[in-house]
């Protein structure tokens, strides 16, 4: 990923190296709590039902506590019966967002900041992107996480 903007001295053209050609699809999944980013997971490739079920089973489920609420958008891989069963078996509740409502999904604000930080790091390879994500996650303070939830209309 490359920065979207830059600056140069007046009268001089801005030059920067940016990737072009074929790119690889990378997926980052995480949970947002009122005080931290939880259950981060990075995979090479797009998300599908099987990989999302693996994420829920191996990464998210161990962090869930009874009474937690899992907010999901309407991506097809989120609606699988196995996923719903796994989340409910941990004592957590499921809440599916209405279609086309990213403003109600607080993790979207996290992803926007995360993308900005990755672009700023100018990570060009899969390993560099993964390392940039690892360095960026501590930048999310407890106050900021609580603000993302409040901004989307959730109270904790």
Question: Where in this protein do the model-derived segments appear?
Answer:
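Short functional hotspots at interaction and active-site rims
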Residues: 1-156
């Amino acid at each position: 990923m490359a920065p979207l903007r830059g600056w140069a001295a007046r009268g001089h053209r801005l030059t920067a190296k940016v990737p072009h050609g074929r790119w690889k699809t990378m997926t980052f999944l995480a949970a947002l709590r009122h005080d931290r980013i939880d259950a981060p997971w990075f995979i090479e490739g797009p998300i599908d039902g099987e990989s999302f079920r693996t994420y829920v089973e191996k990464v998210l489920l161990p962090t869930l506590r009874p009474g937690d609420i899992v907010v999901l958008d309407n991506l097809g891989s989120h609606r699988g019966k196995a996923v719903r069963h796994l989340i409910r078996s941990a004592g957590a509740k499921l809440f599916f967002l209405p279609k086309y409502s990213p403003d109600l999904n607080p993790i979207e604000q996290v992803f926007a900041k995360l993308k900005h930080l990755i672009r700023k790091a100018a990570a060009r390879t899969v390993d560099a992107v993964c390392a940039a994500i690892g360095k960026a996650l501590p930048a999310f303070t407890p106050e900021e996480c609580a603000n993302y939830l409040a901004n989307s209309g959730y109270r904790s």
